[in-house]
Amino acid sequence: MSRPILVFDSGIGGLSVLAEIRKSLPHSDYCYLFDNARLPYGELEEQVLIAGCVALVCDLVARTNAMIVVVACNTASTVVLPALRANLSIPVVGVVPAIKPAAQMSKSKRIGLLATPGTVKRHYTHELISQFADDCHVELFGCSELVMMAEQKIATGQMDMHRLADLLAPVVAAQLDVLVLGCTHFPMIQAELQQVLGAGVTLMDSGAAIAKRVVTLLTQQNLIVEERRVTNERETLGESAMQAFYTKAEISEGLTTTLIDCGFSTIERITTTN
């Protein structure tokens, strides 16, 4: 494995970001680290969150010789990014809720942000709204339960649509034309969200913007892998280029199958003391 792109999240939500990056950089190697032992991040004390994330990510960067870290978690991005950047010499990219493009796209100037309670209440989020959506009426919806529903869907293939409709009732009532998905888990259930909200609501996430930023940074450092590498007449891209690491004692058969279907050949538990 060459120097990989390390994508980090609390759970499986970051797979949506990894998929966007792979569209732009299909020949790169990838590590996916998900700290599912401490999911959901939005309920952790900030200092506990920072200490655990820094320890996990820095250890795996050292182990894999990663060339860039993508924090594919909105909660971690608003809290942990400065500490990670202070402890790493490689680029660290975070997630920014797509407030600016949502405000630009909205015709009714009624937009919403669906995220975890932690992201909704953070000062950074309100700064984004003031800076980029001052001409819009912005509704904020914080819901941790949707994160666990996305995890459950990946693990079992099942989604409680009645419960989803109940959770989204305030969003429907707000009569928005654009809704920002402010958690990387939410694109994993985008079809179900769209079904409940209807075709009149455009859903926006940050995946494509993150991928663009990663490409820019790696291009600046001349680290783009331009073509498939061939060893013994076989391409090394694929199974050998995809590694997944998790922190919980065990993961479900459904999640294991999902990771294999995504192309991961190595699925390994790592431990943390934080």
UniProtKB/Swiss-Prot annotation:
UniProt GO MF annotations: glutamate racemase activity
Keyword Cell wall biogenesis/degradation applies: yes
Keywords: Cell shape, Cell wall biogenesis/degradation, Isomerase, Peptidoglycan synthesis
Pathway this chain belongs to: Cell wall biogenesis; peptidoglycan biosynthesis
Family, as annotated: Belongs to the aspartate/glutamate racemases family.
Binding site for substrate: D9, S10, Y41, G42, N74, T75, T184, H185
PROSITE patterns listed in its UniProt record: ASP_GLU_RACEMASE_1 (PS00923), ASP_GLU_RACEMASE_2 (PS00924)
InterPro entries xrefs: Asp/Glu/hydantoin_racemase (IPR015942), Asp/Glu_race (IPR001920), Asp/Glu_racemase_AS_1 (IPR018187), Asp/Glu_racemase_AS_2 (IPR033134), Glu_race (IPR004391)
Organism of provenance: Shewanella baltica (strain OS155 / ATCC BAA-1091)
Coiled coil: none
E.C. numbers: 5.1.1.3
Role of this protein: Provides the (R)-glutamate required for cell wall biosynthesis.
Keyword Secreted: no
Organism superkingdom: Bacteria
Name of this chain's protein: Glutamate racemase
Active site: C73, C183
Matches recorded under HAMAP family: Glu_racemase (MF_00258)
